[in-house]
């Protein structure tokens, strides 16, 4: 009973990645990044300072950095310590009593940062007994980028649940780890052929970074996300101060839009009151930039 000690193994090579049955691509506007169960307790079953765990930590760091730059929400799951037998239920029959008070935190190299979301996880799937689905529905998100451990247990269960909830799951095949290399490869094969899309890290990064031009609808979505409300609650002609948008949130939004290629300043936006007026400022800045480029 319990989790076995895990021998090191090399991550799958690009040639070993399975062909996907779908042609899905990651849309940064629709995606959420899940960092699944990267707690000291689970990571410590791997051999320290060796593949796959050292490699996937580095890969998840890169994935998270790209996601945050693209404005993709980052969600962590972590199991609690000292679970009551009633809460743990059937998991005890397979894995014992679970975590004690030690080694519960996320590994230091992947520690959650300000703005990241943390959910307590009780079952294999990240959707069970957590607010993950409600969050994604409220934010209008339809894609889940999945990283972490263990591949054939929680990663696969979460992928299957996402698929059956009409959410496109993307498993980053070299940003997950498993009990064995064979388990790892079987997980990727199953996902690619039955329930989701398997991506290499480099593929995922390219898709995350290939952002579409900013639209009025995306501005509305970004403001709603910043305020923790739904997009239809942000009227295009309402004064944004009355909705609750303060200067700090506005500065964060301006920085996000800078990263998407918009040449606007915080001062310019503050001279406008509503979303529709903000959009006019952005369009004017685009026109001026095009005029200067032609000249």
Swiss-Prot record:
Q: In which pathway does it act?
A: Siderophore biosynthesis; vulnibactin biosynthesis
Q: Which residues carry this modification: O-(pantetheine 4'-phosphoryl)serine?
A: 247
Lineage top rank: taxon: Bacteria
**Cofactor requirements of the protein:** pantetheine 4'-phosphate
Among InterPro entries, the record links this protein to: ACP-like_sf, Isochorismatase, Isochorismatase-like_dom, Isochorismatase-like_hydrls, Isochorismatase-like_sf, PP-bd_ACP
The note on cofactor binding and number reads: Binds 1 phosphopantetheine covalently.
Which residue intervals make up region (Disordered)?
1-21
Record-listed E.C. numbers: 3.3.2.1
Q: Which UniProt keywords apply?
A: Hydrolase, Phosphopantetheine, Phosphoprotein
Which EC class is the enzyme in?
hydrolase
- The answer, when asked if Phosphoprotein is one of the entry's keywords, is yes
Record-annotated Carrier domain positions: 207-286
Q: Name one GO molecular function term.
A: isochorismatase activity
Which catalytic reaction applies to this protein? isochorismate + H2O = (2S,3S)-2,3-dihydroxy-2,3-dihydrobenzoate + pyruvate
Recorded hits in Pfam families, A to Z, give: Isochorismatase, PP-binding
PANTHER family given for it?
A: ENTEROBACTIN SYNTHASE COMPONENT B, PEROXYUREIDOACRYLATE/UREIDOACRYLATE AMIDOHYDROLASE-RELATED
Report the protein's function.
Involved in the biosynthesis of the catechol siderophore vulnibactin. Vulnibactin is a chelating compound involved in transporting iron from the bacterial environment into the cell cytoplasm.
Q: Tell me its family.
A: Belongs to the isochorismatase family.
- The name on file for this protein is Probable isochorismatase
Task: Name the source organism.
Answer: Vibrio vulnificus (strain CMCP6)
């Amino acid at each position: 009973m319990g989790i076995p000690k895990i021998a090191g193994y090399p991550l799958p090579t690009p040639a070993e990645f399975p062909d996907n049955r779908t042609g899905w691509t990651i849309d940064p506007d629709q995606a959420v990044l899940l960092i699944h169960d990267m707690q000291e307790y689970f990571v410590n079953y791997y051999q320290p300072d060796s593949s796959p765990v050292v490699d996937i930590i580095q890969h998840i760091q890169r994935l998270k950095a790209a996601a945050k730059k693209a404005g993709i929400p980052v969600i962590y799951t972590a199991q609690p310590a000292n679970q009551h037998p009633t809460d743990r239920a059937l998991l005890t029959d397979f894995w014992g009593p679970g975590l004690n008070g030690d080694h519960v935190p996320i590994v230091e190299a992947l520690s959650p940062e300000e703005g990241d979301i943390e959910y307590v996880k009780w079952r294999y799937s990240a959707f069970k007994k957590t607010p993950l689905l409600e969050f994604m529905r409220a934010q209008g998100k339809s894609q889940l980028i999945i990283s972490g451990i263990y591949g054939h247990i929680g990663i696969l269960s979460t992928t299957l649940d996402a698929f059956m909830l009409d959410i496109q799951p993307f498993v980053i095949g070299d940003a997950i780890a498993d009990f064995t290399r064979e388990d790892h490869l079987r997980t990727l094969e199953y996902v690619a052929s039955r329930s989701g899309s398997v991506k290499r890290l480099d593929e995922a990064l390219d898709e995350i970074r290939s952002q579409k031009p900013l639209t009025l609808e995306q501005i509305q979505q970004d403001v709603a996300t910043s305020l923790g409300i739904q997009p239809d609650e942000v009227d295009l002609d309402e004064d944004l101060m009355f909705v609750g948008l303060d200067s700090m949130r506005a500065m964060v939004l301006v920085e996000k839009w800078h990263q998407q290629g918009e040449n606007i300043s915080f001062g310019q936006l503050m001279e406008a009151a509503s979303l529709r007026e903000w959009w006019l400022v952005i369009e004017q800045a685009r026109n001026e930039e095009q005029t200067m480029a032609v000249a």
